[in-house]
Structures are given as C-alpha cells and as structure tokens.
Amino acid sequence: MGIVRSRLHKRKITGGKTKIHRKRMKAELGRLPANTRLGARRVSPVRARGGNFKIRALRLDTGNFAWASEAIAHRVRLLDVVYNATSNELVRTKTLVKNCIVAVDAAPFKRWYAKHYGIDLDADKKSTKAAVAAEKKGRKSAHAAADKYDVNKASPKLQREWTRRRRNHRVEKAIADQLREGRVLARITSRPGQSGRADGILLEGAELQFYLKRLEKKKK
C-alpha cells in the first residue's frame, strides 16, 4: 500500500508502543502531494472514499481569476510563480499551490477595461522599464494586437455610457501600471491538487502593496 495514515505505528503518550493486531486498511491510504507545475494542462482523476473523485492536476497553464473590485472574472494564462510564503523551493520549481502568488496575463482584463470604461491604458502609458524592455525585445505578438479594443470606434450612445461610468470610477495606480506592463499579480485560492484547477483573485489594496514590497526586497 505504501504511504499510510495509520495510528498503529505511533507511540502512545505514556511511551508505550501499540501492538499491531491487524493489517492496514484501504481507508488509511495516503498519497504523494500533487506538486502541480506550470505547463500544458495535465490532470488525472483519483478515486476517493465513497466512490467520489478528486481531480489531481499535474500541470496547469490557465485559470479563472477574479478582479474583485470590478466584480468580473476572466480565464487567463498563468505566466510565472513569483512568491510563496512557505518555500522558495516551490517558487524555483514553479509549483502551483493554494495561496501562492502568480503573475497572470493582463490582456483579457485590459480589453474588458477598455470596453467597459472606454479607457485605453496603452494610449497614455508611461514608458516603464518593463514596457520598454518588452518593446525592445519585440515580445508584442500579432495575436495581442488583434485582441486590442479600439475605443475610438464607439457609437455616441456608448460614449455617453462610458462618461456615466467614469464619473465615480477610480482604478488603483499599482493595478493600472501592471495592466500596462501586461502582467498582473494574483493569488491562487483553489487547491490544484484536489480540484484540478488554478483559480484565484487579483491582488489589490494593502495586500498588493505588501507583496510588491516582498518582491522588491527579494530582488535586493
């Protein structure tokens, strides 16, 4: 059977040793951790107690991520694992676990933002180091250019709607900068080894500032 969660081999509080009077049971079976890595999707079903099935993700490259303050969610590409409070080894091996911090593709959120508010974040972007480096290396693909939404082709009715929406709207500067760069920090809230998915939320507010400081400190 291999790994077991049996109590038979444990010592008692008094120091005595339990006498093993029976064989190990299937219910006591333990399994190796999934260690879900970043890569082309590969999942496998695992039969659990009661005939139920867990979905064990071995490789994942996409997930559903929510932008909580805007009440939207998009399926986006996972780009990198950038921080894990538990272990730097999990960052080095790009292992996806619950509560790890990942960088996700900003394109779907940027496109939604342009369609919903009529604001093209690329039009007035400052030449940040990351953006300049990306342009120099020619990373901007034809696919990304095709996905871009043209805010200048909107109807008068839609422009009036945009004006109404922008009246009391304000986006956090740190998030806007990330959207311009094309990479947004997010936290995984699902359990890839149990549900077979890597879903999560974008970092905002104090949480985002905390992890930005951590990453800056890590670089030094």
From Swiss-Prot:
GO terms for biological process: maturation of SSU-rRNA from tricistronic rRNA transcript (SSU-rRNA, 5.8S rRNA, LSU-rRNA); translation. The keyword Ribonucleoprotein applies. It comes from the Eukaryota. GO terms for molecular function: structural constituent of ribosome. GO terms for cellular component: cytoplasm; cytosolic small ribosomal subunit; nucleolus. The keyword Ribosomal protein applies. Keywords: Ribonucleoprotein, Ribosomal protein. Belongs to the eukaryotic ribosomal protein eS8 family. This is Small ribosomal subunit protein eS8.
